[in-house]
Amino acid sequence: VPKFINSSFACIIDRGTHKANNYIQHQMQIFKRNYGDFWVLKCDIRRFFYNIDPNILYHILCKYIGDPYLKRFTKQLIFDGRDIIGDVGIPIGNYTSQYFANIYLNELDQYVKRILKVKFYRQIYG
């Protein structure tokens, strides 16, 4: 299981949109108090679930899965039904899809926090 950044709230036990909203409000108050005025950038990944590359997703998941049986099962979850949904994308509504999407974007989160060193970074998925 990947280590999500502290400000990740989607599909994580005892988190969610309400806690995310409270977290953001609290962080904005701290930022305003310490730094004054600031800008907020709100982005959305258009048709995100429909554009997830299943090969990339599977590669990411395999970093966290050691058991060969579980890898095969995960591969089935991702690739079975490709004839219905096409070459890219994962089904919307499946809990596994929501969790997989969180893991998929965790790569971006880690890059933004660890490589770019963005101090105040927040996202909500799902």
Annotate each PLM feature.
Residues 1-9:
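Electropositive, glycine- and tryptophan-enriched low-complexity nucleic-acid-binding patches
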Residues 10-20:
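Long, hydrophobic, well-ordered secondary-structure blocks that form the structural core
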Residues 22-125:
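Conserved polymerase palm-domain catalytic core
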